[in-house]
Amino acid sequence: MDDVVIGLEVHVQLNRLRTKLFCSCPLNYHQSPPNTHVCPVCLGMPGAMPVINKEAVKAAVKVAMALNAEIQPFTVFDRKNYFYPDLPKGFQISQYDRPLALGGYVTIELDGQEKRIQLKRVHMEEDPGKLSYKGSITTAKYSLIDYNRSGAPLLEIVTEPVMNSPKEARLFLNKLRMILEYLEVFDGDLEGAMRVDANISIRGSGRVEIKNISSFKGVEKALSYEIMRQKNLLQRGRSVVRETRHFDEARNITVSLRSKEEEQDYRYFPEPDLVPVLTEEIVREVEGTLPEMPEEKRERLKRQYGIGDNFAKVLILDVKMADYFEEVAKLVDPKLAASWIVDVLRGELNYRDWSFAKCWEVFKPEEFAKLLKYFEEDRITEKGVVEVIRTKLDEGGEIDAIIQKKGLFAIPKEEIIKFCKEAIEENPKAVEDYLSGKRQALNFLVGQVMKKTRGRADPADTAKLIEEMLS
């Protein structure tokens, strides 16, 4: 898809902060009734004066540093003028020619190769309110407006147009989200935490912007549809109109909203009620506070715990998962811990649509380590461990109580040997078949032992014992 050119504008809400960008209204509005976390400032009342939230600026500087961007010596806020119902002042306080940071990059892994996605700028702005529609944006007869979100601190991270496929765009977004969560300035599980405007053109044709896509899967689908739509137009000898489009998630298509605005349409000018922000002192405050970033953690986990890169690169995808692994690895063999967390526990959480943050509450690392310790000591089978994990996640309870209730403690080896002998004695035909070279007969004999033990024997160990007895 070398003829496809994609650039993204990613709007990130700094939702781990306590208050909004220019007022003291609390940010924890997501479960609140509409229009209850508002004040004259975020409602744009005449005479209300904004005051910059220093913690928001520090968080923004931290993000810019982690993205390898160049922090500017001073930064200025501007008024971006346009009329829309979710913008009560009639303008948005944003940044134009003096953004917080310029340049930077995010490294992704694409088809086994590293690629740097170059950034154009990182700037701060306030979030508008939230519009809701009965039905869809294209069919609704009226809009409802909730201003609880109005004035929330946003970072806009703008890439250069250097991506060539929807897959590449999604990989970039996944990596960006990971970095933001490591910095603890952002909770990606909250609604509206990350919204994307995707710009796409083909072979130098008209650039189309797809506005306000709320999920990474949606970005990939919207871009895929738009590539198909634009190529179809070009193949028929028609031109691609420069416009703004909306992604209809129900139909997986994009629909036209309006002609594309030019920058001059917004009539930017400096915000007269806010002084320029000098960043040198803030940079000094933030320097040294950056946490270990994903790639650094990946290398350390391999070095410190002796695990393979195949496990390390998965563990770092979620900082809570990596931290969970480290707690478990203090108590059991790290390689065993990595294997069970990556291959089993992660899958069970995904099946339930749970995050590792929730896992910390429901299935504490020391409990998981205790279960793996039983497995190491051959006190429970692999199948039994999986059953305990599922029961613990679904019903709760103590590990020992679950194992006792379900009868999952492994049978002593002496008893398994006794059951193997019984299976051999009771099934002479299967023994004869096995000795004549029919390997499936061994599976039958193992199955008989599993019946006798009600699944508490390890199938691989049982097969090995039977083979030794019949050799």
Curated annotation (Swiss-Prot):
InterPro entries: Asn/Gln-tRNA_amidoTrfase_suB/E (IPR017959), Asn/Gln-tRNA_Trfase_suB/E_cat (IPR006075), Asn/Gln_amidotransferase (IPR018027), Asn/Gln_tRNA_amidoTrase-B-like (IPR003789), GatB (IPR004413), GatB_C_1 (IPR042114), GatB_Yqey_C_2 (IPR023168), Gln-tRNA_amidoTrfase_suB_CS (IPR017958)
Catalysed transformations (reactions): L-glutamyl-tRNA(Gln) + L-glutamine + ATP + H2O = L-glutaminyl-tRNA(Gln) + L-glutamate + ADP + phosphate + H(+); L-aspartyl-tRNA(Asn) + L-glutamine + ATP + H2O = L-asparaginyl-tRNA(Asn) + L-glutamate + ADP + phosphate + 2 H(+)
Gene3D superfamilies: 1.10.10.410, GatB domain, N-terminal subdomain (1.10.150.380)
Domain of life: Archaea
The keyword Ligase appears for this protein: yes
Alphabetized SUPFAM superfamilies for the sequence: GatB/YqeY motif (SSF89095), Glutamine synthetase/guanido kinase (SSF55931)
GO biological process, one term: translation
Keyword Transmembrane helix part of the UniProt annotation: no
One Gene Ontology MF term: glutaminyl-tRNA synthase (glutamine-hydrolyzing) activity
This protein's UniProt keywords: ATP-binding, Ligase, Nucleotide-binding, Protein biosynthesis
SMART domains reported in the protein's UniProt record: GatB_Yqey (SM00845)
Function: Allows the formation of correctly charged Asn-tRNA(Asn) or Gln-tRNA(Gln) through the transamidation of misacylated Asp-tRNA(Asn) or Glu-tRNA(Gln) in organisms which lack either or both of asparaginyl-tRNA or glutaminyl-tRNA synthetases. The reaction takes place in the presence of glutamine and ATP through an activated phospho-Asp-tRNA(Asn) or phospho-Glu-tRNA(Gln).
Family: Belongs to the GatB/GatE family. GatB subfamily.
Assembly and interaction partners: Heterotrimer of A, B and C subunits.
PANTHER family hit by this protein: GLUTAMYL-TRNA GLN AMIDOTRANSFERASE SUBUNIT B MITOCHONDRIAL AND PROKARYOTIC PET112-RELATED, GLUTAMYL-TRNA(GLN) AMIDOTRANSFERASE SUBUNIT B, MITOCHONDRIAL
Protein's name according to its UniProt entry: Aspartyl/glutamyl-tRNA(Asn/Gln) amidotransferase subunit B
Lineage: Archaea, Methanobacteriati, Methanobacteriota, Archaeoglobi, Archaeoglobales
